[in-house]
Amino acid sequence: MAVAISGSSLISSTLQHYNNRIYIRDYPIPCHSSNPICNSFNFKRRSFSPSSPKFNDHVVNPSSSYLSSKLSPIRTHSSFAACGCSWIQDNSMVHDYATTTNGTSKRCSALPTTNTVDVSSVSDLFEFICSGPLVNKIGITPQRVGQSIDKWLLYGSQLCRLFQLNELKLTIPQKARLYHYYIPVFIWCEDQIALHNSKFKDGDDVPPLVIGFSAPQGCGKTTLVFALDYLFKTTKKKSATISVDDFYLTAEGQAELRKKNPGNALLEYRGNAGSHDLKLSVETLEALSKLTKEGLKMKVPRYNKSAYSGRGDRADSSTWPEVEGPLSVILFEGWMLGFKPLPADVVKAVDPQLEVVNKNLEAYYDAWDKYIDAWVVIKIQDPSYVYRWRLQAEIAMRQDGQAGMSDEEVNDFVSRYLPAYKAYLPTLYAEGPSGSDPDRVLAIDIDEERNPILAN
């Protein structure tokens, strides 16, 4: 006789199951310590007391050789820039104090003062996850969260290690960034890969899924893709990351573009449509899609933005990173991915100089967008956020003793992109990218602090 179980009972029993197991196998050592320690996600057996609705942690001694053999080191993200923190774009996520490049400690003035929160309670974490703005949007039910809570714990622990966060004492913004943003998006990406793979038969060469990330500059898309790429690698899925920046014209090509468009500020520097090597884009995307077997390798283009006094040039091919098949996914990010050409009178009303950029944009669908199978579109409420985000980054760089643009230079830099944002974002947000399947587009609204929010 079948027994019906209510949703709440299923969640309760699932959490009880996960809280009576030992969270040890395949969990990384916490990033804030070089020695194995007992913390909220590692080396604890959690028991559930029916008489008391709370979880009790019991420490397990992790000194056995078996445990040591399971705790292999994981690479951490240790590059420091801007205000001396590993979170370059996501300032609200870093520790209140950071180490500058000369070894001195200073307060990060860009950070809000937030209280730390203890995430040791799995039941509290479950409730926090379910309160996020993305869970319903991507079809993650409370039942599914309960059934996969061990994955959420694992992914959270891995991201804490990557970004050198103390997983015992995450601030509320840190906790939200991981469990309301990065991990839900990663789970959505996993679902998209599973859907993609299901369309092929056993034994077929399955091309990697291409996920496009369209998001304005400074909103944190590079950090998001960095986190997703890391999680894919820790889950044994091979991934490749590329950016529209990788396909900018060479310095010589940029000079020719300026010469052909005298007086057009939108094409004076790299950035807008027309300043990319679309042939290289096609060659790269098609070559990556063929990395379906072990042993197949290729180098992926990269761009050196600091060359020629900041005008930039393609990096020497000897420095390009190498990727190896079989690839499961390609993460392709860019500020103008998915932009569609508009009628000439519409773009001229925004900025007359945008007309030639709009004409150039006609070639971009066949070079970029048609290769993208699924989309993450990060939406902002006001394009002027880009100016404030860029200004924050440059101020932080100057405070750290690095070369940064002045406020006036930031204004000039961003002004070359704002016409495109004003012209193309409304259509992108209303209709989605050209040729995209609405069921495979994840639209994420973020606020000025770069956190996901519920759309109005």
From Swiss-Prot:
Coiled coil: none annotated. GO terms for biological process: oxidative photosynthetic carbon pathway; photorespiration. ATP binds at A215, P216, Q217, G218, C219, G220, K221, T222. Induction: Isoform 1: Expressed in the light. Isoform 3: Expressed in the dark. Residues 1-63 form a transit peptide. Its EC number is 2.7.1.31. InterPro entries: P-loop_NTPase, PRK/URK. Catalyzes the concluding reaction of the photorespiratory C2 cycle, an indispensable ancillary metabolic pathway to the photosynthetic C3 cycle that enables land plants to grow in an oxygen-containing atmosphere. This is D-glycerate 3-kinase, chloroplastic. It comes from Arabidopsis thaliana.
